[in-house]
Amino acid sequence: SGRMLDVLVGPAGAGKTTAMNALLRAWEAEHGPGSVVGLAPSAVAAQVLADDLGIATENTAKWWQNHLLYGTTFEAGQLVIIDEASLAGTLSLDRITHLAQDAGAKVLLVGDHAQLQSVDAGGAFAMIANDRDDTPELVDVHRFTHPWEKTASLELRHGRTQAIDSYLAHQRITGGAAETMPDAAYNAWRTDRDKGLISVLIAETHEDVTELNRRARADLIHDKTLNPDREVELRDGTAAGVGDTIITRNNDRRLRTASGRDWVRNGGVWTI
């Protein structure tokens, strides 16, 4: 485009990663290996980007800290991909794009402004995408097996209430009293697990999450799936031992895996 800042918009499952891989190959063919770097608002998202594209990545806050402390910056001819850009604060994006411009690099913001927004003051990604007449947007969703799911996901993205009717018609939503739904959700999760399916149990409050985790762990101990002989107490008062799955809630680069290549990230999922 000739611009130093471009955007790529796409709903979940539309092929943004595939598009970025194609762009990576084309850019490196012209500018050389290692000329594409990646950033993302969270450490987990940055790691996903690194795994998907095979490039060096960092989260935006850490990169900015490295810039302030060590003078880290960009190089002329580099392509800086900022993934999940709708989650990045406007000030963060402004700082990074100005540094890229000064260095002669190009920035590509990738994401979906119809999904979650930044915790910080945000909206820059949506503003740029909506302000331009030639913003590229991926519109075909490839992630789902059933055609109705593709349509419903896009309706949900655009805030169209008929999406709810689709999910109800296909028995994807179950309603009930607040007192009974935790039991219903837990039993559905347990049924899936007993069938060998991958199932995720999500609750609205920390209290509900803690209680459901206690219940699930007690059942797994009863089934002898878990051994409670050696365990440690977690922050919410629950316990964990060998075989348990936990989620870490802070970034701590001092806590590394045995290989030394991976470290504890906020939102990281681990098996003890």
Each PLM stretch: what is its role?
Residues 1-3, 23, 102, 110-271:
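Conserved helicase motor core of P-loop NTPases
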Residues 6-168:
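ASCE P-loop NTPase helicase motor core
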